[in-house]
Amino acid sequence: MCDQQQIQCRLPLQQCCVKGPSFCSSQSPFAQSQVVVQAPCEMQIVDCPASCPVQVCQVSDQAPCQSQTTQVKCQSKTKQVKGQAQCQSKTTQVKGQAASQSQTSSVQSQAPCQSEVSYVQCEASQPVQTCFVECAPVCYTETCYVECPVQNYVPCPAPQPVQMYRGRPAVCQPQGRFSTQCQYQGSYSSCGPQFQSRATCNNYTPQFQLRPSYSSCFPQYRSRTSFSPCVPQCQTQGSYGSFTEQHRSRSTSRCLPPPRRLQLFPRSCSPPRRFEPCSSSYLPLRPSEGFPNYCTPPRRSEPIYNSRCPRRPISSCSQRRGPKCRIEISSPCCPRQVPPQRCPVEIPPIRRRSQSCGPQPSWGASCPELRPHVEPRPLPSFCPPRRLDQCPESPLQRCPPPAPRPRLRPEPCISLEPRPRPLPRQLSEPCLYPEPLPALRPTPRPVPLPRPGQCEIPEPRPCLQPCEHPEPCPRPEPIPLPAPCPSPEPCRETWRSPSPCWGPNPVPYPGDLGCHESSPHRLDTEAPYCGPSSYNQGQESGAGCGPGDVFPERRGQDGHGDQGNAFAGVKGEAKSAYF
C-alpha cells in the first residue's frame, strides 16, 4: 500500500516545510500548537492508502537548519520520501544537516499513522513562500522540524556539599525563626529528647554532656565537644543559643579574656548537631575539624565576640546592632522548620553606640577633646539604656559649685598659644562648655553643643573641665554601677570627675588628685588624671597638665589598658581597636 514514491515541491524553492503539530515540552512556546517550520529541501508528508488533502507549507528561505528525521512505520511497508528541489540533490538517510540540500526521510508508520515530529528552529531571513505537497491515499505523517528553545531548559545548580542533619519527626522541631541578630527566637518543641547523640535523648541538664545536644535554647557554654549550661556565665566563642551582643574585650578589665582553647571551635549560629553523620541516604557529613557538625559548615563569623561577664536581661535593647554572624542552613537533610536564612556579618564600627539602648547623651559633647576622635563603637545591646538623670550623682552635684565660677570659665580658658586638639571623643567627661549650664547638665544631650574652639591656656595644662569649683571635689570612692555591665562598653553616665585643671591656674593634687579609683566598667567614662602620681607623662614637674600632656587610659584589673581609648595629647597618637 505504501509504495515508495517521490514527492517534490512544485515550486522551485530552496527549502520546503510543512505545517504540523509539535511535541515540544509543555514549557515550549511551540507546545500544543500548529507551528510552521521549514527543513532544507525536504518533503515532509508521506501518504498511505487514504486520500488526504493537499498540504500547504510555508517556506522561509533561512539559514541552514538542523533537520532531524522521524521514522513512522506505516502498516507493513516503508516509504522512502525523497525531497527534490532545484538545489543540489543529495540523498541522506535518516538524520542529517544540510543547507539547501535534499534529505531523505525514512518514514514508517503503524496502522493508523500517528504523527511524530522532530524540531529544527531557524531564523527567518526572506519572505515566506508557499509550496504544495501532493498526497497519495492512505495515512499521512506530518513531520515538522523545530528545535525546542534552549531557554526553556534551566539547569539546576549543582548542589553544594553541605553539612546535613535531620530532625526527628516530632522531637525538637524548631518553631521560630532566626532573627537578623542570629538569635534563634523560638523554641524547640518538646525539648526533652533533643537531636539524639546515639540512640538516647539527652535532656538539657546542668552537667556537661559528653555528646552535644541542643535543648531549651539557653545560652550554652561549649567545652570541647559538649554543650553545657551557662546561664550565669559568659558565652564562649562558638556557643549557640539566643545570642545577645557579645563583644570582644581585648584587654579590658571588665571581663576575663576568653579561654584560648575555645578559639579552635567553629563559631556558628547553626544549631548544634549530632556528632555522628545523619542517615546514609543524605550526603556524607563533612566533619568540621573534629568538632560537632552543623547543618551547614560553621562559618567563622568573626564578629561573635565573647566576654565572661554575667549576662544581663535584654530589657530594652530590642533592636540590637553590633556583631552578627552569618547563618546558612540549606540542605535537603535539614528539617524544613529551620528556614534557610542568611545573617549578614556586620563588623561593628569602633565606638558606635547602639541606638536601641535608649537615648543617651552624646558623650564627648561636653568635653574638650582630650583624646583623638575614634569612630564610635556600639554600646552593648543588653546594657539597659541610661540617661543622664539615671546615672549616679556626679561630683559636681556632690560638691556644690560656687556661683561665679561658671561665668569666669571662658577667661582662664583663653588660649594664647592654641595647639591642635584631637577630634571629639565620645566620653562621659563633662568638661568644657562656652557657658556651662548647670541646670541642663543632668539632662541627656544627644546632640553635642558647638564649642568655640579648643580651649587651651598657656598654663601647664588647659582647662579640660568646667571651672565650677574653686577646688576639686575628691571622690571618696568610685560610684558603683547599678549592675555589672556585661559588655566592654559600659552604660555611659555623665561623670564629672575632678581635674587639677579646673581653675584658671592648674592646681597640682597629690595622690590620685581626688579622682576615684577606676572601676572595670568605667574605664571610658572617667576624666583623665594628671598630676605627679597619675598621668602627667608629658610633664616632668607634675604640677599640672600641659599642652603636650599625654593622657593614657587607666589600666584595667587584668593589666590591659583599654586599647580603644589610648590617647595622647599633641605628641600622642590615637589607637583604636575593635570591641
Curated annotation (Swiss-Prot):
It is found in: Cytoplasm. One of its GO terms (cellular component) is cytoplasm. Its main location: cytoplasm. Residues 551-561 have a biased composition (Basic and acidic residues). Induction: By calcium and in psoriatic lesions. One of its GO terms (biological process) is inflammatory response. InterPro entries: Keratinocyte_PR (IPR052881). The modification Phosphoserine is found at residue 394. Residues 526-579 are annotated as: Disordered. The keyword Cytoplasm applies. Expressed in the upper layer of epidermis and psoriasis (at protein level). Expressed in the upper layer of epidermis and psoriasis. Keywords: Cytoplasm, Phosphoprotein. This is Keratinocyte proline-rich protein. The lineage of its organism: Eukaryota, Metazoa, Chordata, Craniata, Vertebrata. The gene is KPRP.
